[in-house]
A protein has these predicted regions:
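Conserved structural scaffold segments of CAZyme catalytic domains across common CAZy folds
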Residues: 67, 74, 96, 121-123, ...
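Glycan-recognition surfaces
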Residues: 1-66
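Carbohydrate-binding surface patches
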Residues: 102-147
Length: 182
């Protein structure tokens, strides 16, 4: 479902957060690299925001230009992660909204969204800073995991990973995000 023509951050992130309260995430179509979404925020935010819904990609540069290899690598890796890890459970994901109230999220400077597979074997949490974010730490508490299971947690920004129990993730992990709209 094309839920909005507003693809510009930070509103696009807020729309995804809100629409996943009414629709399953695989029915929330999110576009990357089109309809002015390139005007604000990092490419990371646009791509990762789209990964939490039905991801649609547009062109990432003029047809006659050579694509920036860093952009190509990031988009390719992200699409691979989406296809191999998120999309297999997206149509039946349990959705949790750590920041359900847009007004409160704006005051806090960030919004987050958690998707978990029905068998609780995999999940993803996206955290996105808004225009008011001045940089710093954000405490995230998973809500949909199994407390007794152990999960390999991968931090997509730097690729680091660690093993954590569901109980530890539900107590919270801290993410450092240095800037707004990332």
């Amino acid at each position: 479902t094309w839920v909005s023509d507003k693809q510009t951050a930070p509103r696009s992130i807020e729309i995804t957060n809100g629409m996943t309260m009414a629709l399953p995430p695989d029915r929330v179509d999110r576009l990357v690299a089109g309809m002015t979404c390139h005007k604000y925020a990092s490419l990371d935010q646009h791509v990762r925001g789209a990964m939490l819904g039905h991801m649609t990609l547009n062109v990432f540069g003029p047809a006659t230009a050579e694509m920036n290899p860093d952009v190509f690598d990031f988009v390719s890796r992200s699409v691979g992660l989406y296809k191999s890890f998120i999309r297999p459970f997206l149509n039946e994901a349990r959705v949790y909204h750590p920041t359900p109230d847009c007004k409160a999220a704006r005051a806090a400077g960030y919004t987050a969204l958690e998707l978990v597979s029905p068998d609780q074997k995999r999940g993803v949490i996206g955290v996105f800073t808004l225009t008011g974010w001045m940089g710093g730490e954000i405490d995230l508490r998973a809500r949909g995991l199994n407390r007794g299971k152990t999960y390999r947690v991968t931090y997509d920004n730097d690729g680091a990973s660690e093993l954590l129990t569901g109980a530890a993730l539900m107590r919270g992990v801290t993410a450092f995000i240095p800037s707004a709209l990332s």
